[in-house]
Amino acid sequence: MEPMVERFVRYTSINTRSNEESTTIPSTQTQVDFATNVLVPDLKAIGLDEVIYNRENGFVIGTLNANTDAKAPSIGFIAHMDTADYNAENIKPRIIENYDGNDICLNEEHQIFTRRTDFPNLKNYIGKSLVVTDGLTLLGGDDKAGICEIMEALSYLVAHPEIKHGKIMCAFGPDEEIGTGADHFDVKQFPVDFAYTIDGESLGQLEYETFNAAGGTVTLKGVSVHTGTAKGIMINCAKLAMQFDALLPGAAVPEHTCGRQGFLMLMSMETQVDTGKMNYIIRDHDKELFEAKKAFFLQAGQTLNEIYGREVCEVSVKDQYYNMYDIIKDNMECVNVAKAAMEKAGITPICDPIRGGTDGSKISFMGIPTPNIFTGVENLHGRHEFACIDDMKKAVEVIVNIVNIEK
């Protein structure tokens, strides 16, 4: 088994699921253990000039010094350790060589298949080698593929000093999946001119536009009395929840939008007769439309209170991250360098806006422009997740091309 593939299988077998209910940094001890017992020793074994673990924010930082006196940018590469909110216990990665294009049986005992009819993207991988799950867990290629690709590129550069480069840094962080990891990123520990998150999906993705994002909370306040005497008195929070959601634009939801169209999405809801809570996410690429959606959301609460003539709901909105393009548009060197690196590797860059965000969204606003590059992983966050080994190798090639000053 090739070193990168062996590393990927080994890393994905380790449970590093984050926990949004936790108050610790990182949110789970498994991420701490992975960072200190696996990543730090492995980076040191590669031969980096410096490797540290920041116990305050959970980031592993590695540095490979420049090997030339020529003028060259300092470049960073970032990936996250945690996996999404899906079963990550007892992950059993399996390699499929030379995929034949048929349905993939993940688990014969439980009759779990990744079917071509459900996942037409499978046709893009005929003849390539895939890493799949046993159907009972996610894979964790998001983002351990990114980690492995960065490490493989660093290992290659250490072994090939004839490739001249400026200072290279890597950062492996926690809690990206719950949206809190980059909040604690220390840019002073990461002095680079620009960086890349290696956290995209299919071959060729180069992303430098994200959503603007906010979370909305609706606290419902009802009145509970005996149903026999409820007329004119009871206010049922379950009904309030339905009324509030009906005040929002019905077409502006994820299942009816695409491209640069934004949305409001009800993520969770819990009600009893006299109490209730609703959690929403609000997304749009355009800053003005983003602000308009937040205002509409807040107005829905006021409207519901006016209907009842009393405060039956309390609505709040909190911004989460912003569109990195607002920063990167004035710092396009990082995009142009990545495009050239992909083209040198025989890859056509695919520059579509992300219908989501990355750690790079926040890090860009901290002063380090940070676009996102593909990993070769698809069907994220579930049992049908898979990684394409061939495309992972291409990601490594792109990273090496990015830092090579002899373009």
Q: Where are the predicted features?
A:
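N-terminal helical capping/dimerization or prosegment-like subdomains
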Residues: 1-58, 64-86
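Short, conserved micro-motifs enriched in small and acidic residues
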Residues: 29, 33, 137-148, 231-239, ...
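Active-site metal-coordination/substrate-binding segment of hydrolases
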Residues: 70-167, 172, 394
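Glycine/charged-rich beta-loop-alpha catalytic/anionic-binding loops adjacent to active sites
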Residues: 123-137, 221-225, 345, 377-381
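Acidic/histidine-rich catalytic neighborhood of metal-dependent amide-processing enzymes
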Residues: 123-210, 251-267, 271, 277-285, ...
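Phosphate/diphosphate-binding glycine-rich loops and adjacent basic-rich segments that engage nucleotide
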Residues: 197-223, 227-230, 234-240
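Metal-dependent amide/peptide-bond hydrolase catalytic core
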Residues: 238-407
